[in-house]
Amino acid sequence: MVMNVYRQIDRSDLQFDFLLKEKVDDGYEQEVKALGGHIFYVESPKKIGVKNYIKNVKAVIEQNGPYCAVHSHMNVMSGLIMFSAWLSGINLRISHSHSTRFTNSFPTIILGKTLIKIFANKKVACGQKAGKALFGQSKFSVIPNGIDTAKYYVYDENTRSILRRKLNMKLDAFQICHVGRFVDVKNHKFILEVARELKNDNVNFQVHLLGDGELFDEIHQMANEMNLEEVCFHGSVENVNEYLKASDLFILPSKYEGLPVTLVEAQSAGVKCLVSNGVPTEADFNLGLMEALPLEKDIWVTRIKQCVSNKKRIAQSDIESAIRNRGYDIKESANKMLEVYL
């Protein structure tokens, strides 16, 4: 979401620098540098302790500024960033919520929320539920996770076939796509269990897993042990839009979510989306593309098999109208974000 906004803004008036806790792909580093920004790294509080983390964040801010604002997207952990920014004399301190639940320990959640309440002077969320989860009754602004909609439109089936050849997808197979980091909340083990049942039922399919993360190797090994050659691991890719446009189905069986931008992207591509009950309904375009299911394997297997035999396309004009009406166009999101900084 941040990169989408960064690409849209007038960078002669406003520049972004990025502070991360782990290495990103070289492609992103090169793009940020080309756009005039910088990327800095600070190890997580879990690795170096809270005191050292605050000290290091403060040092990055003070040694590379001056900055007009610090904008944190770390959910509960934004509290430490807000405190560090306050110590560094930053006048505008923005906490941004992207999730409806948090996996941190109870003391960490209490500390983070308290620091945000005291030291963040602007609060933003991707949706109402995500905002209430982090900020409670405090006032916050909602800015949808906008996308560059033109990248996701599919005008004809010939385009889809061309993309499948380019991406080495089987032309005759039902193509399923998932986008997300390999972390517990994304529920990749559930995806493998569903894939095994589809294979046992002789369904002609492929599953494409896009993303990386701490559980990547473990999930990859599990797929090998389950002989799931139908499951393809692509790592982090820059052409997510092409995989979505080439797919028949997008799945998101997360244990919980904020308002996932990948779900917005998938609907923008006109792809049927099966999601868990942990995904907020406000992510639905109301075009019949999104369907929420309980996290029960048999239900998912049955529903996917039904999707295989009943492929339905939504008119592009209806998709475009839904995107505009819900404020998911990146230009509108970028403008709203700029208003936060002013």
Question: How would you describe each model-predicted region?
Answer:
Residues M1-N4, F174, H178-E197, E214-D217:
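A conserved mid-protein helix/loop that constitutes part of the nucleotide-sugar donor-binding site
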Residues N4-K55, E214-L215, V340:
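N-terminal strand-loop element at the rim of the active site
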Residues L19-L20, L263, K272-S276, E282:
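Short hydrophobic beta-strand element within catalytic cores of glycosyltransferases
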Residues K46-N52, K132-Q137, G146-K166, L171-D172:
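Acidic anion/phosphate-binding donor-loop and adjacent secondary structure
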Residues S72-L80, S97:
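Short His-centered aromatic/hydrophobic patch
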Residues H220-G235:
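Nucleotide-activated donor-binding/catalytic signature segment of Leloir-type glycosyltransferases, i.e.
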Residues S236, K255:
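Aromatic "clamp/platform" in nucleotide-sugar-dependent glycosyltransferases that forms part
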